[in-house]
Amino acid sequence: MNKVSGRSFTRTSTCLLATLIAGVMTSGVSAAELVNSKALESAPAAGWASQNGSTTGGAAATSDNIYVVTNISEFTSALSAGAVAKIIQITGTVDISGGTPYKDFADQKARSQINIPANTTVIGIGTDAKFINGSLIIDGTDGTNNVIIRNVYIQTPIDVEPHYEKGDGWNAEWDGMNITNGAHHVWVDHVTISDGSFTDDMYTTKDGETYVQHDGALDIKRGSDYVTISNSLFDQHDKTMLIGHSDTNSAQDKGKLHVTLFNNVFNRVTERAPRVRYGSIHSFNNVFNGDVKDPVYRYLYSFGIGTSGSVLSEGNSFTIANLSASKACKVVKKFNGSIFSDNGSVLNGSAADLSGCGFSAYTSAIPYVYAVQPMTTELAQSITDHAGSGKL
């Protein structure tokens, strides 16, 4: 692990950046600059992460708590600074398994779940920062809050020992990212989460049933709050985003789970974009692409409204192949919930009429200032062009 100072850095050329990174990785001495000055940015005002305080991550880090890391050993060492403000810059692929395959459920649980402490910014350098074979966990059990994750690719973990549930088949356990147990003030920006090199058509069968090895992409649950997800790409995944742990978890979740989603792309995701229990979700200017006849990631729905969950959808784009205008209500599914409103969204190039889908209007006030751009083909393409890792 190599520490770098807190002075800002203006990138003048690709060669200069490459030289700096090479020096950090090979010399074993402290470099002179902060490689990615965007690590000093706070969560945008247009989002729940800006409310009831702010989300600054590790922006206040002193020079001895700014790092460049290239592997899991360096990453966990940097995280060991605890709640002190820190900036952890990622270059290349971090294999959370350390190159040693997980033997079984217990081994995967022990080694694959990486807890990100309070006052931390994790940010990728350049275009190839990546996490594989594990999960980033933002767990509020010990008071964790004020975390920023930016410009990284997360390949969803593969459960090496799924559990079997009678009537439901094989179920996997691990998510790409999990915000849980009261964690609050979290900003996820320019992140890509995808099944990557192991897609669902590669599942085998066991005891006559599909051996499912993926769980969620990004889950937010158990009383977590004040989260903004922006400019991110969710690609090729089934159960994408669960907000709210269960129908019976009202004691922990009620009045929490305020989440904003904007300028994100949900591409070839089957469902849960998101599925909501108890949470209050604001989704605007996002792009949803799918196909109800996709042979691998068959589109089921985007918004799932569960127990006491509510969603305000504004200016979103739905391009769903083989879905007619008369079936527009397929984009929002009722799971014991009743509150959903949409304004200005587009389905397959025409205004989406979601007013007759059987929901009550979303009436809660949005406390922050935001601007919904009218959804056009050009805007949808621009959002797509700028979403995900490597686009910061």
UniProtKB/Swiss-Prot annotation:
EC number: 4.2.2.2
Cofactor-binding details, from the entry: Binds 1 Ca(2+) ion per subunit.
GO biological process, one term: pectin catabolic process
PANTHER family: PECTATE LYASE 18-RELATED (PTHR31683), PECTATE LYASE 21-RELATED (PTHR31683:SF18)
Protein name per its UniProtKB record: Pectate lyase A
Binding site for Ca(2+): 173, 175, 215, 219
Family listed: Belongs to the polysaccharide lyase 1 family. PLADES subfamily.
Any one annotated GO CC term: extracellular region
Keywords: Calcium, Disulfide bond, Lyase, Metal-binding, Repeat, Secreted, Signal
InterPro entries: Pec_lyase, Pectin_lyas_fold, Pectin_lyase_fold/virulence, PEL
Keyword Transmembrane helix: no
Catalysed reactions, as listed in the record: Eliminative cleavage of (1->4)-alpha-D-galacturonan to give oligosaccharides with 4-deoxy-alpha-D-galact-4-enuronosyl groups at their non-reducing ends
